[in-house]
């Protein structure tokens, strides 16, 4: 699986996930800096108030 891993509005970058990792995620939240977006491999557990979208195809988490 390959997932995007750039932060917020940085130029697109992606990486290959470890063997057996078939999910990508996109987390989004707001703080004093504005809206923060984090992308990567897997499907992490998030705290309340953080939007999480997990998906299972190549580069699906932009």
Curated annotation (Swiss-Prot):
Subcellular location: Secreted
Disulfide bond listed as a keyword: yes
Comp. bias regions, Polar residues: 1-16
Disordered: annotated segments: 1-21
Tissue specificity: Expressed by the venom gland.
Predominant location category: secreted
InterPro entries associated with the record: Snake_3FTx (IPR003571), Snake_toxin-like_sf (IPR045860), Snake_toxin_con_site (IPR018354), Toxin_cobra-type (IPR054131)
GO cellular component labels: extracellular region
Disulfide pairings: 3-24, 17-41, 43-54, 55-60
Pfam families for the chain: Toxin_cobra-type
Protein name: Short neurotoxin C
Lineage per the UniProt record: Eukaryota, Metazoa, Chordata, Craniata, Vertebrata
